[in-house]
Amino acid sequence: MEEIKVHIGKTVALMNDNIDTDQIIPKSFLKRIERTGFGEFLFDSWRYLPNRKPNPDFPLNAPDRQEATILITGDNFGCGSSREHAAWALLDYRFRVIIAGSYSDIFYMNCTKNGVLPIVLPREAREKLAKIAADENVTIDLPNQQVISSVGTYPFEIDATWKNKFINGLDDIAITFEHIDAIKAYEQKVDSI
């Protein structure tokens, strides 16, 4: 997992509430188990017209928002069926940070396990951030747990374990390898019984 200590990036806002995993990535695109190649299908039914041309009215298609790495969105983001592909699609598209009012528990966990930092902020803060100009950067300061922007600085909460994983770029496998000596010692002990 790629570390996130301080992330500086541009934003795009999709302020809908209750965006479910089928809207994030439709089930028709879930026929692979590789983690890459899903970004082109992110928000597919909204991003594309029936003829597969980009929908000019969809925020992610705005020419001045093409460099966005921070998605600002509504409440209950990632609700619906458990679908790790949704986190893969967001990351593959290039989003490193999602700022929402709340998340489905399973979706939140899928994001944290796949290197997408889910931040919870109140609606008032998100509405201000949603109005930031396309050429402005927003800073996510994870060690100090702050979203810093021209419209304000907003503190956020994150579990200490997840914070450590993001700051150090550790996924579950990397954490397991940190304990490899203890694992080997246990295996030798069990094998000798």
Swiss-Prot record:
It comes from Listeria monocytogenes serotype 4a (strain HCC23). This is 3-isopropylmalate dehydratase small subunit. InterPro entries: 3-IsopropMal_deHydase_ssu, Aconitase/3IPM_dehydase_swvl, AconitaseA/IPMdHydase_ssu_swvl, IPMI_Swivel, LeuD. Belongs to the LeuD family. LeuD type 1 subfamily. Catalyzes the isomerization between 2-isopropylmalate and 3-isopropylmalate, via the formation of 2-isopropylmaleate. Keywords: Amino-acid biosynthesis, Branched-chain amino acid biosynthesis, Leucine biosynthesis, Lyase. It catalyses: (2R,3S)-3-isopropylmalate = (2S)-2-isopropylmalate. Gene3D superfamilies: Aconitase, domain 4. CDD domains: IPMI_Swivel (cd01577). GO terms for molecular function: 3-isopropylmalate dehydratase activity. Pathway: Amino-acid biosynthesis; L-leucine biosynthesis; L-leucine from 3-methyl-2-oxobutanoate: step 2/4. One of its GO terms (cellular component) is 3-isopropylmalate dehydratase complex. GO terms for biological process: L-leucine biosynthetic process. Heterodimer of LeuC and LeuD. Its EC number is 4.2.1.33. It is an enzyme of class 4 (lyase).
